[in-house]
Amino acid sequence: MTINPVSRKVAWLRVVTLAIAAFIFNTTEFVPVGLLSDIAESFHMQTAQVGIMLTIYAWVVAVMSLPFMLLTSQMERRKLLICLFVLFIASHVLSFLAWNFTVLVISRIGIAFAHAIFWSITASLAIRLAPAGKRAQALSLIATGTALAMVLGLPIGRVVGQYFGWRTTFFAIGMGALITLLCLIKLLPKLPSEHSGSLKSLPLLFRRPALMSLYVLTVVVVTAHYTAYSYIEPFVQNVAGLSANFATVLLLILGGAGIIGSLVFGKLGNRHASSLVSIAIALLVICLLLLLPAANSEAHLAILSIFWGIAIMVIGLGMQVKVLALAPDATDVAMALFSGIFNIGIGAGALVGNQVSLHWSMSAIGYIGAIPACAALVWAVLIFRKWPVTLEEQPH
């Protein structure tokens, strides 16, 4: 099934709107990282206790990505996007109104349901909507939306939370989603489901050792990153003893470096994805090991955050490119699995960071995160030597 030919301008406008949607979805996933202290104060809880919200959100996405993708596999994609945006917006209104922590968690579960479906279909939709021969650029644009969520979304969300309250941050995200929904309704054609795969494609994917090895690498390296990243805001304030404003600046630097990582991968990723990902994981190991030693200086933390941000963006993009290359016949199923596995890593990392902070010391989150990062580095070198693969640009 093909989409009726449209002008390149309209095609790019559709992809840009999807990228904006990616920005909004990733902003709401990441923004609690910058608001943990404020939410904890609001509900008279410890920061580490509130942090369990990150794990719940991520694991709901992980568990529901594949079931929701299969349940909606035959649903027309434009209608599906509209439905999940309505759920997303309503859940943000509930976040804004949340009268206790339990209600806030329930609202986040609603958002996670929408997230689970959105990220399982977005990459394949971007490829379908892009101008002919521009699939890699379309994916890069979606990745840019993801990066901007860390560069702009998370820090702006934190600033709004600081000055107007964390509830206003969630309300603003909901309103941004409403505007994006109206644009999607206006711009998108009917998009019959295609290449979505089904349960029948699962055994086929599971019989691909390169893909399974990549999924293992994903969960380990993401766990490593989020062990430290989930608690970077309270770490900066409580361990490093630096200001709340500097915590905001650090999040901005970390996200901004992600844009650099995206540009680097855009230039070299098609030909050197394996090498780039391996180097980025090695860089992540170094950054995690140096997190506590760097905490004695704003400058040291800022420099470390630049390399950390570049590393994690290259890792994320590299994984996505490789998954798409290894499962071109079942992109939605493969990406649903990838999204689920990625979020298992987010939830596991946030939980490890939570337990270290509660029962040991928040100062150790970098060292603890470096342990799975080292394991990921060894695994990456082994599997990329055995199964080197790249995503070739193909006209469609």
Swiss-Prot record:
Keywords: Cell inner membrane, Cell membrane, Membrane, Sugar transport, Transmembrane, Transmembrane helix, Transport
Main location (coarse class): membrane
Keyword Transcription part of the UniProt annotation: no
GO molecular-function term, one example from the UniProt record: carbohydrate transmembrane transporter activity
UniProt-listed Pfam families: MFS_1
Parts of the chain that traverse the membrane: 15-35, 50-70, 81-101, 103-123, 136-156, 169-189, 209-229, 246-266, 275-295, 301-321, 333-353, 364-384
A GO CC annotation given for this chain: plasma membrane
Localization annotation: Cell inner membrane
Disulfide bonds: none
Membrane topology recorded in Swiss-Prot or TrEMBL: Multi-pass membrane protein
Function field: Involved in the efflux of sugars. The physiological role may be the reduction of the intracellular concentration of toxic sugars or sugar metabolites.
NCBIfam families documented for this protein: PRK03545.1
Family: Belongs to the major facilitator superfamily. SotB (TC 2.A.1.2) family.
Protein name according to UniProt: Probable sugar efflux transporter
Organism: Salmonella schwarzengrund (strain CVM19633)
Gene from which the chain derives: sotB
